[in-house]
Amino acid sequence: MFNMNINSPVRFVKETNRAKSPTRQSPYAAGYDLYSAYDYTIPPGERQLIKTDISMSMPKFCYGRIAPRSGLSLKGIDIGGGVIDEDYRGNIGVILINNGKYTFNVNTGDRIAQLIYQRIYYPELKEVQSLDSTDRGDQGFGSTGLR
């Protein structure tokens, strides 16, 4: 079912000369760093759509997951949204959320997030009247304990 060539390159376009190619910082890095194409200021408690000026073609049966960078997370910067569908071809934008106490500045060329390619399965959904029971049932949000 997943007949994809893992050696096929992913095609991308730099939409402007401000765009920087996605990069991996080590041979085994899970994600490709995405870079801001512009300067932004994000006050505490606010969010901002950061444009990369990169568009790309996702591999077949894959989607792109926008994930936080650990160094930014340490500063209180998180990611909102974060899914690039297989058929999306527009400018990749990253929603940065400033959960910190201080204004956060993004400069042109800053690494803002990482793009991780993940396989996806498109199941057929079927509505039913009830589901099989399990020991856990409908117990959620902390029901399995802390330890």
Curated annotation (Swiss-Prot):
Catalytic reaction equation(s): dUTP + H2O = dUMP + diphosphate + H(+)
User: Which enzyme class?
Assistant: hydrolase
- One Gene Ontology term from the biological process aspect of the record: dUTP catabolic process
Which NCBIfam families is this protein grouped with?
dut, PRK00601.1
Recorded superkingdom: Viruses
General function of this protein? This enzyme is involved in nucleotide metabolism: it produces dUMP, the immediate precursor of thymidine nucleotides and it decreases the intracellular concentration of dUTP so that uracil cannot be incorporated into DNA.
Q: Where does Mg(2+) bind?
A: R24
Q: Give GO terms: molecular function aspect only.
A: dUTP diphosphatase activity; magnesium ion binding
Q: What induces it?
A: Expressed in the early phase of the viral replicative cycle.
Q: What is the lineage of its organism?
A: Viruses, Varidnaviria, Bamfordvirae, Nucleocytoviricota, Pokkesviricetes
Known cofactor(s): Mg(2+)
**UniProt EC number:** 3.6.1.23
Q: Which family does it belong to?
A: Belongs to the dUTPase family.
Would you tell me the protein name for this molecule?
Deoxyuridine 5'-triphosphate nucleotidohydrolase
Protein source organism = Variola virus (isolate Human/India/Ind3/1967) (VARV)
The record, for InterPro entries, names: dUTPase, dUTPase-like, dUTPase-like_sf, dUTPase_trimeric
- Residues noted as binding dUTP in the record, renumbered to the chain: P68, R69, S70, G82, V83, I84, D85, Y88, G93, I95, R111
| Keywords from the named record | Early protein, Hydrolase, Magnesium, Metal-binding, Nucleotide metabolism
KW Transcription (keyword) present: no
